[in-house]
């Protein structure tokens, strides 16, 4: 695995289900005041950064749990490969079939100075919400660089039939 210049690599899980004869995927919306009014093109698969010498699938599972509050069962994963985001960050993803109540998802938190230069430190959720989307909806919501994961998921499911 090669990383960007800063060595940043993320690993994540694209959870999917069939609902009402349609394929749906679970996407996450980043938390914090800088993301409040951002929607189309600003959602992501639940993912997080890899620390040195960590096993990538373990990172993907851990980050999924941290960002959704949901422990992924020991279910088979389908490798979706990697993409590179505009920032240069490398993102690796796996797909898992599963279901969860998106309304009960709870993310871990982070702290930052807010408002900027105020001297006040506030706590924000890393992910402020997760939602299920059809593939067509997800293509509009997801960061453009991550859309190929949807195509790869669709191809993997079709090949498995």
Question: Positions of the model-derived regions?
Answer:
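Hydrophobic pocket-lining residues within nucleotide cofactor-binding pockets
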Residues: 50, 72, 100, 105, ...
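Residue-level detector of high-confidence beta-strand sites
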Residues: 28, 80-82
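The catalytic Nudix box helix
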Residues: 44-80, 134
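Short, charged/polar surface micro-motifs in flexible loops or helix N-caps
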Residues: 19-22, 32-35, 51-52, 87-89, ...
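Charged phosphate-binding loop/patch that engages nucleotide di/tri-phosphates or the phosphate backbone
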Residues: 135-161
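Active-site-adjacent beta-strand/loop module that shapes the phosphate/pyrophosphate-binding cleft
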Residues: 82-119, 131, 153, 160
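N-terminal strand-loop-strand
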Residues: 2-44, 94
């Amino acid at each position: 695995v090669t990383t960007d210049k800063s060595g940043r690599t993320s690993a994540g899980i694209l959870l999917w289900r069939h609902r009402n004869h349609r394929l749906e995927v679970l996407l996450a919306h980043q938390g914090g005041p800088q993301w409040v009014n951002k929607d189309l093109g600003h959602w992501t698969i639940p993912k997080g950064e890899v620390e040195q010498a960590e096993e990538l699938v373990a990172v993907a599972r851990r980050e999924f749990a941290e960002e959704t509050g949901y422990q992924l069962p020991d279910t088979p994963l389908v490798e979706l490969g990697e993409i590179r985001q505009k920032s240069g960050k490398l993102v690796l993803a796996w797909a898992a079939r599963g279901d969860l109540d998106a309304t009960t998802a709870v993310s871990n938190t982070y702290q930052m100075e807010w408002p900027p230069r105020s001297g006040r430190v506030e706590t924000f959720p890393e992910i402020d919400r997760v939602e299920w989307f059809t593939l067509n909806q997800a293509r509009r919501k997801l960061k453009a660089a991550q859309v190929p994961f949807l195509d790869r998921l669709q191809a993997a499911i079709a090949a498995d039939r």
